[in-house]
């Protein structure tokens, strides 16, 4: 007989357990049977929730499905008992069911989640995009009106980029101010020492060289520069200072 005629109903689904499927009358009718030999093999499948909580590996189970072979009449017939046992032993030793049980557990968990949340018509990608955590984009510090200025990169002969180092040269204004202060202090100290040695009174008056100097900048803005120089009023004091600087003392 064919398998379609021997198909059995699924039975009742109770306490979240899969019904027991009975493989009956599959063997060929022409095959002789001994007295007391039962051809009905009952296969007990675990429940879905037990697979979700802790996946069991079917390595130590003895009730495995009976392997079927195609007979000459078009139906399915069971092989001999020795060949069936050999096939079962080789399958259990060669195949590892841990990876398959893990995949089945994940698929069952996902199907159970879709059933509970009533989202059976959606795919995994839709649910993933819905529950994915979106990180906020980095806000630019500069405004849109101001252009973003970036430092230029210098290209070497080998084609690599080199960022230009920051200039450590001081501006002329800072150099002039620093030199003026240092020269003024040194000049004043030397003038005081020379005045004590030469017994000459050097006045501390300030004689302006140029009161107002109007120069035009590149931006056409007039700037007024005030320059002042401290010079002694006595010619003898100036000569003594020149002699002091030129001497080896």
UniProtKB/Swiss-Prot annotation:
Q: Name one GO cellular component term.
A: MBF transcription complex
Please give one Pfam family short name: Whi5
Summary of the function given for this chain in its UniProt record = Negative regulatory component of the MBF complex involved in cell-cycle-dependent transcription.
Among its keywords, does the record have Secreted? Answer: no
Induction remark: During G1 phase of the cell cycle.
Q: Phosphoserine-modified residues are where?
A: 145
Q: Provide the family line.
A: Belongs to the WHI5/NRM1 family.
- This protein's major location comes to cytoplasm
- Where is the segment annotated Disordered? 208-230
Superkingdom is Eukaryota
Keywords per UniProt:
Cytoplasm, Nucleus, Phosphoprotein, Repressor, Transcription, Transcription regulation
Q: How does it assemble?
A: The MBF complex is composed of at least SWI6, MBP1 and NRM1.
Q: Which residues form a coiled coil?
A: none
Protein name, UniProt field: Transcription factor NRM1
An annotated GO BP: negative regulation of transcription by RNA polymerase II
Q: What else is known?
A: Present with 2880 molecules/cell in log phase SD medium.
Listed GO MF terms:
DNA-binding transcription factor binding
InterPro entries, A to Z: TF_Nrm1/Whi5
Q: Where in the cell is it found?
A: Cytoplasm; Nucleus
